[in-house]
């Protein structure tokens, strides 16, 4: 069963529930207050920013204009309703109706959604990796059904721009990172093992102080939040690594909430999720270039890793990529087929990987 069919079946079940209650709760059915939450703040991060700028206003306007219903969103970003580690559980419990969560902070429960972290160096373009990964989600329905046990319906997500490395010191060869403490979040921590660095688990909300105080001397991050959070004030060097764009910020709806929404509201919501996804990736591309320029203006030294060093790192990490594919298999998911199909689709969509992994 494809992810799309899974969504349709869940929606159909929801319509039956709405029909059963419509005659007695018409006033309730006409007006919906929906709590939407993300652990990160909006402005620096496209995946959250476009909830506020695109999804919420578009759904609100269209529901009012095209249906007999109204929708009012109660927005809670930056941990005001649920923090980075609480969004999945809060959506499951119904504290949140619509949750946007980084799967990087759910390495066990949302293991499968960290697919792009497990296959670095394919492409740093979110306009390639976003559509590619969403097609993978369509072809392999376990990306949707994994949310069943958490009482949620997966409705999509947009891809980040390319990951890079900000440091407090200049460097050119990966050997220079040996033993250096570098912060990263969850599934991208192992990238540092193959660069020889000493990894430190962290999150965006604590990076500035950690860099400033010397808890670590570098951070794995894309340039837009590096500039937006002003990390360049305390770490003056940024290297474009080419680790890749990732789709790892799934948006879900609590199943009870989804069941209460009429079919015309659901239709609008799913259509506007498509618009949201494109907006996230458009913002990512735009901010990637502008953020690098802004970092230079901020006094940060910006450089590219270079194809030779990038190729060395990709080759070194290949055994780990195979290990992750095997972990999917061990959990009952077709990891080898998924990883191979991801690389195949990415190339069809325009990716030129620095190294093509052999998944055994």
Annotate each language-model stretch with its function.
Residues 28-128, 145-360:
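N-terminal secretory/targeting leader peptides
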Residues 21-29:
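Sec/Tat signal peptide C-region and signal peptidase I cleavage site
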């Amino acid at each position: 069963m494809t992810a799309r069919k899974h969504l349709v079946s869940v929606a159909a079940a929801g319509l039956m529930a709405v029909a059963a209650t419509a005659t007695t709760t018409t006033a309730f059915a006409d007006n919906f207050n929906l709590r939407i939450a993300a652990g990160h703040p909006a402005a620096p991060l496209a995946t959250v920013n476009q909830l506020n700028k695109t999804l919420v206003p578009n759904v609100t306007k269209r529901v009012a204009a095209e249906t007999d219903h109204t929708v009012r969103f109660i927005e809670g970003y930056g941990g005001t309703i649920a923090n980075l580690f609480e969004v999945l559980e809060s959506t499951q419990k119904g504290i949140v109706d619509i949750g946007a969560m980084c799967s990087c902070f759910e390495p066990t429960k949302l293991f499968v959604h960290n697919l792009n972290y497990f296959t670095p160096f394919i492409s740093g373009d979110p306009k390639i990796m976003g559509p590619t990964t969403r097609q993978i989600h369509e072809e392999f329905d376990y990306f949707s059904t994994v949310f069943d046990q958490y009482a949620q319906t997966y409705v999509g997500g947009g891809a980040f721009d390319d990951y890079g490395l900000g440091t407090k010191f200049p460097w050119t060869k990966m050997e220079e990172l040996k033993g250096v403490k570098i912060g990263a979040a969850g599934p991208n921590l192992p990238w540092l093992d193959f660069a020889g660095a000493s990894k430190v688990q962290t999150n965006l909300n604590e990076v500035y102080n950690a860099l400033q105080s010397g808890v670590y001397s570098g951070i794995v991050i894309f340039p837009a939040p590096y500039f937006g959070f002003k990390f360049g004030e305390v770490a003056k060097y940024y290297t474009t690594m080419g680790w890749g764009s990732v789709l790892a910020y799934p948006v879900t709806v609590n199943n009870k909430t989804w069941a209460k929404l009429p079919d015309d509201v659901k239709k609008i919501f799913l259509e506007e999720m498509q618009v949201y996804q494109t907006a996230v990736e458009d913002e990512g591309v735009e901010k990637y270039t502008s953020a690098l320029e802004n970092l230079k203006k901020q006094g940060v030294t910006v450089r590219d890793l270079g194809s030779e060093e990038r190729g060395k790192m990709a080759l070194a990490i290949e055994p780990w990529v195979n290990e992750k594919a095997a972990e999917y298999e061990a959990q009952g998911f077709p990891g080898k087929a998924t990883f191979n199909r991801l690389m195949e689709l990415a190339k069809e969509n325009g990716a030129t990987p620095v190294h093509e992994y052999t998944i055994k």
